[in-house]
Amino acid sequence: EESVDFGLKHQKLTVIKISENDNSWVDKLKDIDVFISCLASRSGEPKDAHCVDFKLNNLLLEKAKAIECAQFILLSAICVQKPKLAFQFEKLAFEERLRNSGLNFSIIRPTAYFKSLSGQIENIKKGKPYIYFGDGKLTQCNPISEKDLSLFILSCISDKNKWKKILPIGGPNQSLT
């Protein structure tokens, strides 16, 4: 568990690390006003995706409802717009559950992360394969930095224009192909 004080009156961020083998983290949820879930399966494989992208997020949602949490913010992914893979379907299933939960929510769908793309560039430099489709325009994206995404997520707490919405977000520059 890690606490961060933003220097704002009555505002504190508590990061809770979730463990599959230890449920003591559940007890730490009782005083939370806003849930921000950045959970995502590591492999994206069907079993992993169901357990994390749907079931674990759903457990958090049920806890949020039980303690009458004010808001639930979900970090999702832009790729769920045209789902083909198991993790995309699991994310969409949870998004639907969240939208119908009765809680105030924001669903954030970033286009891509600079960190992820830079890792792909390093792999290409090492001679590893990279697959793109057609002329590359189908996979173009406008990546966002971790800092910019974090600030956007936090802005969803107080910006009522971002409540009860699905919010695609990209970086400040032109799309990369």
Which residues make up each language-model segment?
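Residue-level detector of anion-binding/catalytic polar loops
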Residues: 34, 70, 104
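Oxidoreductase cofactor-interface core, primarily capturing Rossmann-like NAD(P)-dependent enzymes
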Residues: 1-3, 22-24, 67, 81-177
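NAD(P)H-binding glycine-rich loop region in Rossmannoid oxidoreductase-like domains
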Residues: 2-67, 79-81
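Short beta-strand segments at enzyme active-site cores
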Residues: 70-76
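Proline- and acidic/polar-enriched loop/turn elements at helix boundaries
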Residues: 41, 48, 76-77, 110, ...
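Short glycine-centered, acidic/aromatic-flanked micro-motifs in structured strand/loop junctions
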Residues: 39, 77, 169-171
